[in-house]
Amino acid sequence: MKHEGFHGRAGFGQRPALLVIDVNVGFTDPASPLVCDLEDVVAAIRRLLDEFRRAELPVVYTTVSYDEGDKVAAAAFIDKIPALLTLEAGSRWVEIDPRIAPLPSEPVLNKLFASAFYGTPLSSLLASAGCDSVVVTGASTSGCVRATAVDALQHGYRPAVPREAVGDRNQAAHDANLYDIDTKYGDVVSVDQVVAHLEELGAAHAG
């Protein structure tokens, strides 16, 4: 079935930020009940980190962790996904995977729910940095990546999602959510396309 009026292009924008969503040890270590297979995703994010840092563009990380008060605030979410209790504040599970560790200047925002915008200063950080768009990476495609892409659009930022730099526990969910994002909320692109855009921005600024 063909649906007219969908699959337009939002575009990258002139000052993108890289969002690294929940690539913490609790999602990458096989010993965790929340683990995703993110080996290839981590490699793709490392490449994007190199390019964004080279271009001196903003990078923002998120993690998920819960102290005792947070467990009350997020009780309904935790009841739905009891494995979230693994993400105890201060534990190794909430630390960013060391293969893509943040620089001291790169903020790591803690969130309690799916979207990186909900209950965090992310929108203010992006506005202060003069960003007009975001490149959303991390996990999981059907959960926090999708929620962040939708909220990015609703906050006025053009979202792009590099397909090699996001991952999920379920391939069908991954594919379906990338389709939905590309149809309605943002642009699903390749890592090569993101890198090419950053190179174009660099050439334009140099000129």
Please report, for each region that a protein language model flagged, where it lies by residue.
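Active-site-proximal loop->helix
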Residues: 169-182
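Short acidic-hydrophobic, aromatic-tinged amphipathic segments that line or gate anion-handling sites
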Residues: 109, 186-194
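Active-site acidic carboxylates
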Residues: 1-103, 107, 198-207
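A short glycine-rich beta-strand->turn/loop micro-motif centered on a GG-aromatic cluster
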Residues: 135-138, 158-171
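Glycine-centered short loops/turns at secondary-structure junctions
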Residues: 54-57, 130, 156
